[in-house]
Regions:
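Short clusters of hydrophobic/aromatic residues that line enzyme substrate/ligand-binding pockets
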Residues: 216, 233, 270
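Active-site Gly/Thr loop motif
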Residues: 208-227, 286
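A Trp-anchored, charged/polar loop motif used as the substrate-binding/catalytic surface
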Residues: 224-241
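Low-complexity, intrinsically disordered short peptide segments enriched in small/polar/basic residues
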Residues: 89, 213, 230, 415-416, ...
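Intrinsically disordered/low-complexity terminal segments and short unstructured peptides
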Residues: 141-142, 155-157, 161-163, 167, ...
Length: 434
């Protein structure tokens, strides 16, 4: 107990956080570190849960979602796909493609006619010109009005980590505010808009979480959903009856399923190479399918609040200072190896907890600050004990001397006042005048 309540431990802990701030805000431009930094800039330890642990287990497919490849088909062929799919009454059809301007009149007319006949169609939109001052987008890009008037819109923007040139998608925004004309309106994400048609209650539960950004709980790549190639849908002999009551997503899945492309592809946590990634692993359409699946199944990821992350880092760092103080007093010769063992043990335990919590409980803990504090704690403790503590002791002694002197001066003043007051007449208890 005597070690725990020691102000020196508090000062050393605060010094660790000062060092962390210095690391964060002081730019390091060291040439030989650059290649390593680029390789690991986009690395997240939690990616291993999706790329290793869950991929090793047979994750079940989501049969409520159907993916349809539109490849680079002309508009009249996409119209034919849409007509065939709509005839079997899916719950909703989402088209992850823009039709920004008129092309061939006959093809445009066919597509507009197919959109008009289909029920519950959602076309993608794109949010642009974000204004950080008020958190509003100034522009919403959509398809041409001849197509867009027959559909709802949902924005396809996702949250992308662009460090090191990668486009890793780990999260998305369910709802954003857009300034149109003189008013500001809320717009739902493409995936959220689609999910509403199949289960509005599930979407309500999702939106009631009121998170500005949601982590995506990936189910898997397109093999975890019903998937149809472009020609399969156009083939009149293909039975499409199974799409009834399901969510259908139409978009680019390569020139064909057998001929993949890098167009509209992203890095995700499912990428087998977590660090120093080479090729993106998932089409944008499949990312939307994973989000729809997560919402409908209610399999959300809960992120650790920032205040809790900071509190945990402070408590662990403070506990380290207490432990190091104990070790250096009782096992001084073994302090160096023991302190290293403590730090390594903490790293192993925290990383295990990080992975286990996400894998088993879909809880994404943020131990970045805690791990950084653990790494710096031993070195900072030694610096404080050997160099800064004598300065703190000197300052504390001078402050105490000054306070003691001020207290003695006050006592002298009070004593003098009391002595002088003895010669002053006082009133009588009878109330008679003096």
């Amino acid at each position: 107990v005597k070690y725990f309540f020691d102000t020196d431990h508090l000062y050393a802990t605060l010094l660790v956080f000062a060092a962390v701030l210095g690391i964060v805000f002081v730019p390091l431009n060291i040439a030989f570190i650059s290649p390593f930094a680029q390789a690991f800039a986009d690395f997240d330890i939690t990616d291993l849960v999706f790329s290793r642990l869950r991929s090793d287990r047979s994750t079940t497919s989501d049969t409520s979602i159907v993916l349809v490849n539109i490849a680079h088909l002309p508009r009249h062929h996409i119209a034919r796909q849409l007509e065939r799919l709509a005839a079997h009454e899916p719950a909703a059809i989402g088209i992850d493609a823009f039709f920004r301007s008129p092309k061939q009149p006959s093809a445009d007319s066919a597509l507009a006619h197919a959109l008009a006949k289909a029920r519950h169609v959602v076309l993608v939109s794109k949010l642009t010109h974000f204004q950080p001052s008020d958190g509003v987008f100034d522009s919403l890009e959509t398809s041409h009005p001849m197509f867009n008037r027959f559909a709802q819109n949902g924005f396809a923007n996702v949250v992308v980590d662009s460090l090191a040139g990668f486009r890793t998608v780990r999260s998305f925004s369910p709802c954003e505010r857009v300034r149109t004309h003189a008013s500001v309106n809320e717009h739902l994400a493409f995936s959220v808009q689609l999910a509403r048609y199949l289960d509005s209650n599930a979407v309500k539960r999702f939106l009631d979480r009121q998170n500005e950004v949601e982590s995506i709980n990936y189910r898997g790549n397109y093999s975890h959903f019903y998937t149809l190639d472009a020609n399969d849908v156009l083939d009149s002999t293909t039975d499409l009856g199974f799409v009834r009551g399901k969510i259908v997503l139409m978009g680019f899945l390569g020139y064909s399923l057998a001929e993949p492309s890098l167009e509209d592809t992203f890095f995700t946590p499912l990428n087998e190479r977590s660090a120093g990634k080479t090729l993106p692993d998932m089409y944008g359409l499949v990312i939307h399918a994973n989000i729809v699946s997560m919402i409908l199944q209610g399999m959300f990821i809960n992120d650790m609040p920032v205040p809790l992350s900071m509190l945990l880092a402070f408590l662990v760092c403070y506990a380290n200072m207490v432990l190091f103080h104990y070790l250096i007093e009782h096992y001084e010769r073994l302090y160096q190896p023991l302190s290293i063992v403590v730090q390594l043990t903490e790293w192993v335990v925290l990383i295990f907890l990080l992975v286990w919590l996400l894998d088993q409980w879909s809880y994404k803990a943020d131990f970045t600050l805690t791990l950084t504090a653990c790494t710096l704690s031993a070195g900072v403790f030694e610096i404080y004990s050997q160099s800064l503590k004598p300065i703190v002791i000197t300052f504390r002694e001078r402050w105490q001397e000054r306070q003691s002197k001020r207290s003695n001066d006050n006592i002298t003043t009070v004593t003098t006042t009391v002595v002088h007051s003895q010669n002053i007449p006082t009133s009588q208890s009878t109330g008679e005048p003096l």
